[in-house]
């Protein structure tokens, strides 16, 4: 009897211990799940999305024409955390975007203003989230800035309209502030205004002439502090604007050492941040490797001449105030004439991968945006047609996705360029008219869906795929954000 009693007592104790064990295990699992949900931005995102739907009056299936809710949610300012763009409470924001540079000019005329709305509507339909377009037109036809500090209010209102329409379609904007080239005025127009050319100075005097630099700083201030006539929101306070770019494709071939351009970038980055510390800032560079680059990187350049253009990818993006790296991809115009389609595809892939590696390594974990990529389907050099161009688009998207899947620095790419129907007279061979290019539109939409699957993930699940260095960088960035989120500290 005593033995049986002891055996029964032992069984009861074992059963009790099992119950306690499984209870504690369940409690730990529940605590971990609560911690994960608390850390993630999922519930914050859902709340913000539901608020958007209630306020906008849409059903969640597409963009609304009403005001977008701001605050710290889905439509707050885009920021950087480590090698990624983030929105809201830290939700990743991988970019699938496009260029349509002429939006402001067409918005001036009521008869063509509808093209702005049309291109945003078509872009949003395939999931494009960022548009890069000019915030300048210096001198000449429909000039925004007619002379130094003198602006055409109707053209400024046209830019206001572009920003307002982008907001309605939930498309963010990247706005370059001047052109390296003569189109839309560019740096040469500033030099002419300052009459520096009378002393034999070329367009590169833009970077060194004190009067010219003063003109440009005044223009920067005028644009950044502009109050939108449609929304009543100052540009520097508007989260519709994702980022400013100092210049479209800056080069200073008159000083191949790169020192002149480097000094200008540093000066202007400081000025932009002094006026608008809230928005991201990019250089607008093409990504050429210059004199400070190791031989292995110089060999990545498409030709030897670009190393003497005065630009220097890594050095230019180490400047205080520059928040992300920018690169362009044009194998058809950069590679030697006669380069085959296969050679151009290989170059595009290696060019993208090299810059992602440098953004993660040499730049200490900085997002890199491929702000222009495209090939022409016209002209004697064209190796692609409207159909085979899809292979180039897929090559760039593929390189981006490989980075995205591992939590790398490839933050997005913007196709050059999306046109609505009825604008063929402006097409130089690079235009993609989405309604007439079903296969291309399908590729773009599929890439948008893939990126959205990453953008919709909670912050913790994105970090799960990153290596420890990226996590440490993200934590450091978060800690520093309370002090100053406006500057990427020079290495």
Curated annotation (Swiss-Prot):
Highest taxon listed in the record's lineage: Eukaryota
SUPFAM superfamilies: (Trans)glycosidases (SSF51445)
Primary gene name: MAN5
Cellular compartments annotated: Secreted
Summary of the tissues where the protein is detected: Expression not detected.
Residue positions of the active site: 249, 372
Gene Ontology cellular component list: extracellular region
PANTHER family listed in its UniProt record: MANNAN ENDO-1,4-BETA-MANNOSIDASE 6, PTHR31451
Catalyses which reaction(s): Random hydrolysis of (1->4)-beta-D-mannosidic linkages in mannans, galactomannans and glucomannans
GO MF term set: mannan endo-1,4-beta-mannosidase activity
Protein species of origin: Oryza sativa subsp. japonica (Rice)
Main location: secreted
Recorded family membership: Belongs to the glycosyl hydrolase 5 (cellulase A) family.
Residue positions the entry lists as glycosylated: 385, 471
Biological-process GO terms, alphabetical: polysaccharide catabolic process
Record keywords: Glycoprotein, Glycosidase, Hydrolase, Secreted, Signal
Residues that hold substrate according to the record: 134, 248, 330, 416
Enzyme Commission no: 3.2.1.78
InterPro entries: Glyco_hydro_5, Glycoside_hydrolase_SF, MAN-like
Range of residues in the leader sequence: 1-31
Protein name in UniProt: Putative mannan endo-1,4-beta-mannosidase 5
Transmembrane region(s): none
Cross-referenced Gene3D superfamilies: Glycosidases
């Amino acid at each position: 009897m005593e033995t049986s009693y002891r055996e029964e007592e032992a069984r009861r104790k074992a059963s009790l211990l099992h119950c306690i064990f499984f209870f504690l295990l369940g409690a730990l699992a529940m605590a971990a799940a609560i911690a994960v949900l608390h850390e993630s931005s999922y519930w914050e995102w859902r709340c913000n999305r539901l608020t958007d739907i209630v306020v906008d009056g849409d059903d969640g299936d597409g963009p609304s024409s009403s005001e977008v809710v701001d605050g710290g949610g889905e439509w707050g300012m885009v920021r950087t955390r480590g090698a990624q763009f983030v929105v809201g409470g830290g939700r990743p924001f991988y970019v699938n975007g496009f260029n349509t540079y002429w939006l402001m000019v067409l918005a001036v005329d009521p008869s063509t203003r509808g093209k702005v709305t049309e291109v945003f509507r078509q872009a949003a339909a395939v999931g494009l989230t960022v548009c890069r377009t000019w915030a300048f037109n210096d001198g000449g036809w429909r000039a925004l800035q007619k002379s130094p500090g003198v602006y055409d209010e109707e053209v400024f209102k046209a830019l206001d309209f572009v920003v307002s329409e982008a907001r309605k379609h939930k498309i963010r904007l990247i706005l370059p502030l001047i052109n390296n080239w003569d189109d839309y005025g560019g740096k040469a127009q500033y030099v002419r205004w300052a009459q520096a050319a009378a002393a034999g100075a070329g367009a590169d005097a833009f970077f060194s002439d004190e009067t010219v630099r003063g003109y440009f700083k005044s223009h920067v201030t005028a644009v950044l502090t502009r109050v939108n006539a449609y929304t009543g929101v100052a540009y520097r306070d508007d989260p519709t604007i994702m980022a400013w770019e100092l210049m479209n494709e800056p080069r200073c071939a008159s000083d191949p050492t790169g020192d002149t351009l480097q000094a200008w970038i540093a000066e202007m980055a400081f000025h932009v941040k002094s006026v608008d510390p809230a928005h991201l800032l990019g250089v607008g560079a093409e990504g050429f490797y210059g004199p400070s680059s190791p031989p292995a990187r110089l060999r990545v350049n498409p030709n030897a001449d670009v190393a003497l253009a005065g630009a220097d990818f890594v050095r230019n993006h180490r400047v205080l105030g520059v928040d992300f790296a920018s690169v362009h991809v044009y194998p058809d115009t950069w590679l030697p004439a006669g380069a085959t389609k296969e050679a151009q595809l290989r170059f595009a892939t290696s060019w993208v991968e090299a810059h992602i590696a440098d953004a993660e390594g040499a730049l200490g974990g900085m997002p890199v945006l491929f702000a222009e990529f495209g090939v022409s389907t016209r002209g004697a050099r064209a190796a692609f047609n409207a159909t085979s161009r899809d292979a180039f688009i897929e090559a760039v998207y593929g390189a981006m996705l490989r980075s995205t899947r591992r939590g790398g620095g490839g933050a997005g790419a913007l196709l050059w360029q999306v046109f609505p129907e009825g604008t063929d007279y402006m097409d130089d061979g690079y235009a993609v008219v989405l309604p007439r290019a079903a296969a291309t539109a399908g590729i773009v939409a599929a890439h948008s869906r893939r990126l959205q699957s990453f953008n919709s993930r909670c912050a913790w699940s994105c970090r799960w795929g990153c290596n420890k260095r990226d996590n440490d960088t993200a934590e450091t960035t978060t800690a520093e954000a309370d002090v100053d989120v406006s500057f990427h500290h020079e290495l």
